[in-house]
């Protein structure tokens, strides 16, 4: 049996950040990753804002940054004039295009340098509970089943959120309309603007969008995310993306060198995400932005919060619902209002015709916005064409 102050389950950005901060706080910390290699396979578009790196004290490094972009462009179905967002206004997914596998390894290395132990190829198999408190996990490590006892467990096991479900947190269960099926190619020999990430809305990606994240030197991540309410299987999703590529002048002559698929949660902030001795972070806690589908930044921030509350709980030997509620309050204060608005917008946008989407994009592309958010965009539309946003007025 092994004993730690903090056990972190999952070696993605949220888990590594939680482990790094917990170790920096002087807590004996173990982070486990079920795969043999942290960061592989890559399962996202790889976009991240510059501000999040600064907030989490992560120094930008060329080893994990493939490209720095000026901003983002959002195209309506007709692909005429796009909405252009400068990177400092464009949210958590615009600024850097990462080499995600190298980024994840870098964060894990920071955790190890801070003093955390790291085990790879070590999946959690079950929850250990004592007197109503989560007290650790059973883990397969080096072909043995090991019991790891911990004063606090931080589950950062991604979309599957297995540990939270095993522990009995029903909030992690998702409705169908809150699940996005995603598929992405890494493409080479393409001709796209390296200064902008591009997003395409409409029936080309039902209940979602297509993205092009340029990585420089004729390479980009080209992917699609669509609600499973509209897409019935991965082949159908692939066909939508292939049709888009065939009709895109800068992509149609390119070649794909990698294909990745996965699921993404796009729900409102859901509670509870704790129980005595357990906190969920990142996608395991359903903290993905419902509009963008981006989650790296939110995983990092929630990992920092979880480590902060772990320190306070362990130092005071208090694992009560009231103590765990401090983490939930931090999460709600940071994400709840924005995610609710973006979730409602996501639901409404999925119902709009291509004609209406084009009208919305045309209206916003004419505006000069000081900040970029769902709220700011809707207010800009309402000022000029209030009838267009009548069905969205509850978001403003």
Swiss-Prot record:
Role noted for this protein: Is involved in the reduction of 2,3-digeranylgeranylglycerophospholipids (unsaturated archaeols) into 2,3-diphytanylglycerophospholipids (saturated archaeols) in the biosynthesis of archaeal membrane lipids. Catalyzes the formation of archaetidic acid (2,3-di-O-phytanyl-sn-glyceryl phosphate) from 2,3-di-O-geranylgeranylglyceryl phosphate (DGGGP) via the hydrogenation of each double bond of the isoprenoid chains.
GO CC annotations on file = membrane
An annotated Gene Ontology molecular function: geranylgeranyl reductase activity
Explain how, and how many, cofactor molecules are bound. Binds 1 FAD per subunit.
Gene3D superfamilies xref list:
D-Amino Acid Oxidase, subunit A, domain 2, FAD/NAD(P)-binding domain
Q: Which InterPro entries match?
A: DGGGPL_reductase, DGGPL_reductase, FAD/NAD-bd_sf, Geranylgeranyl_Rdtase_fam, Geranylgeranyl_reductase, GGR_cat
Cofactor names: FAD
Question: Which key words are in the record?
Answer: FAD, Flavoprotein, Lipid biosynthesis, Lipid metabolism, NAD, NADP, Oxidoreductase, Phospholipid biosynthesis, Phospholipid metabolism
Annotated NCBIfam families? DGGPL_Thplmales, GG-red-SF
Q: Can you state which reaction this protein catalyses?
A: 2,3-bis-O-(phytanyl)-sn-glycerol 1-phosphate + 8 NADP(+) = 2,3-bis-O-(geranylgeranyl)-sn-glycerol 1-phosphate + 8 NADPH + 8 H(+); 2,3-bis-O-(phytanyl)-sn-glycerol 1-phosphate + 8 NAD(+) = 2,3-bis-O-(geranylgeranyl)-sn-glycerol 1-phosphate + 8 NADH + 8 H(+); a 2,3-bis-O-phytanyl-sn-glycerol 1-phospholipid + 8 A = a 2,3-bis-O-(geranylgeranyl)-sn-glycerol 1-phospholipid + 8 AH2; CDP-2,3-bis-O-(geranylgeranyl)-sn-glycerol + 8 AH2 = CDP-2,3-bis-O-(phytanyl)-sn-glycerol + 8 A
Further details from the record = Reduction reaction proceeds via syn addition of hydrogen for double bonds.
What pathway is this protein a component of?
Answer: Membrane lipid metabolism; glycerophospholipid metabolism
Disulfide pairs here are none
Per UniProt, where does FAD bind? Answer: 14, 33, 44-45, 47, 100, 124, 162, 283, 295-296
- Upper classification of the organism: Archaea, Methanobacteriati, Thermoplasmatota, Thermoplasmata, Thermoplasmatales
Q: What is its EC number?
A: 1.3.1.101
Output the SUPFAM superfamilies linked to this UniProt entry: FAD/NAD(P)-binding domain (SSF51905)
Protein name as annotated: Digeranylgeranylglycerophospholipid reductase
Please give the family membership noted in the entry. Answer: Belongs to the geranylgeranyl reductase family. DGGGPL reductase subfamily.
